[in-house]
Amino acid sequence: MSVKTYPIFTFRWLAVHALAVPTVFFLGSITAMQFIQR
């Protein structure tokens, strides 16, 4: 199974990471603010 078999998988991979990375960063900053306030 090669990574460059279908461009759709690459596009889906980019889309998932484009949505997942800011979400994880957003949740991380929220938890950090929660700990800082307490």
UniProtKB/Swiss-Prot annotation:
An annotated Gene Ontology molecular function: electron transfer activity
Q: Give GO terms for biological process.
A: photosynthetic electron transport chain
Q: Subcellular location, in the record's words?
A: Plastid, Chloroplast thylakoid membrane
The membrane-spanning stretches of this chain are: 13-29
Note the topology in the membrane: Single-pass membrane protein
Which InterPro entries does the entry link to? PSII_cyt_b559_bsu (IPR006241), PSII_cyt_b559_CS (IPR006216), PSII_cyt_b559_N (IPR013081)
* Residue numbers binding heme: 17
Q: Which cofactor does it need?
A: heme b
For this chain, the family text in UniProt reads:
Belongs to the PsbE/PsbF family.
User: Assembly state and interactors?
Assistant: Heterodimer of an alpha subunit and a beta subunit. PSII is composed of 1 copy each of membrane proteins PsbA, PsbB, PsbC, PsbD, PsbE, PsbF, PsbH, PsbI, PsbJ, PsbK, PsbL, PsbM, PsbT, PsbX, PsbY, PsbZ, Psb30/Ycf12, at least 3 peripheral proteins of the oxygen-evolving complex and a large number of cofactors. It forms dimeric complexes.
Kindly provide the name given to this protein in its UniProt entry: Cytochrome b559 subunit beta
Lineage here is: Eukaryota, Viridiplantae, Chlorophyta, Mamiellophyceae, Mamiellales
